[in-house]
C-alpha cells in the first residue's frame, strides 16, 4: 500500500499515561495529566511527541494503549511469568496490596489481531472519524485502547495459575508499591467501532495456554 501510517505502542498498561485517573473503565479521551511515576510520564510524553510529528509532517499516526498483555513468550520480569516460575520452583511469589488489585489482562494473540486491524484504520480528516473517536483536530492522529474490557482481581489470576499447574503458590503478601494503581480497565469501544473487533480471550483460557507453553519450553 502507498499510504503511510505510523503505529506506536504508548505503553504496555494504560495505567501509565492515565496515572491517577479513577474513572472506570479507562477511556482514551479521559484526562491523563496525573502520572504517578517517571515511567508513566515518559509514556505521556511519547504520545505528545507523536502528535507533534503527525501535525508537523502530516503523518497519519495511531498510538496504542495496551492493557496488561500476557501469553507465551512473555517477558520474564512480568507477573504471569514470575508467578508461574515461582510456583513451579516452590519459591514465594510477591503479591502486592495483599492481592486486592485489579488488572485488565489482554491475551497476546488478541492484542496482535487488534494491532493488525488498526493498521488499516488510518486516521485522516473528519471523514475518517467514528463514534467515540479521539481523532485530533490538529493532526491525523488518534489514541486507541487495546484491552479485554474485563478487570480481574489479582488473586483470581494467581488462583488460575495454581489450577493449571496443580501447585499451590507460596505467597508473600506485601503492601502496595509506591506509584502503582489499584485497577486498570479498558473501554475498548473505539477499537470495536474502528475495526468491528474486540479482544475476547477469557483469562483462565489465556493462563492455560501460557502454562502449557511454559511446561513445554522449560520441560517442567
Model-assigned labels for residue ranges:
Residues 1-10, 16-63, 70, 74-75:
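Catalytic helix-loop patch of NAD(P)-dependent Rossmann-fold dehydrogenases
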Residues 11-12, 145:
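Rossmann-fold scaffold of SDR-type NAD(P)-dependent oxidoreductases
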Residues 14, 66, 98:
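Active-site loop/turn elements of alpha/beta-hydrolase fold enzymes
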Residues 20, 60-63, 77, 140, ...:
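Non-catalytic, surface-exposed connector residues within folded enzymatic/regulatory domains
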Residues 63-66, 104:
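Residue-level recognition of specific faces of alpha-helices
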Residues 69-70, 176:
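Hydrophobic pocket-lining residues within nucleotide cofactor-binding pockets
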Residues 85-220:
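C-terminal substrate-binding subdomain of Rossmann-fold SDR/epimerase-dehydratase oxidoreductases
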Amino acid at each position: 500500500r502507498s499510504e503511510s501510517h505510523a503505529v506506536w505502542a504508548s505503553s504496555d498498561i494504560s495505567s501509565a499515561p492515565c496515572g491517577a485517573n479513577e474513572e472506570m473503565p479507562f477511556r482514551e479521551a479521559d484526562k491523563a495529566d496525573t502520572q504517578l511515576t517517571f515511567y508513566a510520564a515518559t509514556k505521556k510524553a511519547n504520545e505528545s511527541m507523536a502528535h507533534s510529528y503527525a501535525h508537523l509532517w502530516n503523518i497519519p499516526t495511531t498510538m496504542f494503549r495496551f492493557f496488561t498483555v500476557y501469553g507465551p513468550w512473555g517477558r520474564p520480569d512480568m507477573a504471569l511469568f514470575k508467578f508461574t516460575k515461582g510456583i513451579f520452583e516452590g519459591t514465594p511469589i510477591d503479591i502486592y496490596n495483599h492481592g486486592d488489585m485489579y488488572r485488565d489482562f489482554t491475551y497476546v494473540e488478541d492484542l496482535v489481531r487488534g494491532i493488525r486491524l488498526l493498521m488499516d484504520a488510518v486516521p485522516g480528516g473528519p471523514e475518517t472519524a467514528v463514534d467515540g473517536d479521539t481523532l485530533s483536530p490538529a493532526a491525523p492522529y488518534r489514541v486507541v485502547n487495546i484491552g479485554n474490557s474485563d478487570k480481574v482481581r489479582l488473586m483470581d489470576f494467581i488462583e488460575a495459575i495454581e489450577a493449571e499447574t496443580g501447585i499451590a503458590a507460596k505467597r508473600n503478601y506485601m503492601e502496595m508499591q509506591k506509584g502503582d494503581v489499584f485497577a486498570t480497565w479498558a473501554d475498548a469501544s473505539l477499537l470495536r467501532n474502528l475495526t468491528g473487533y474486540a479482544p475476547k480471550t477469557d483469562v483462565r483460557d489465556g493462563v492455560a495456554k501460557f502454562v502449557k507453553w511454559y511446561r513445554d519450553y522449560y520441560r517442567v
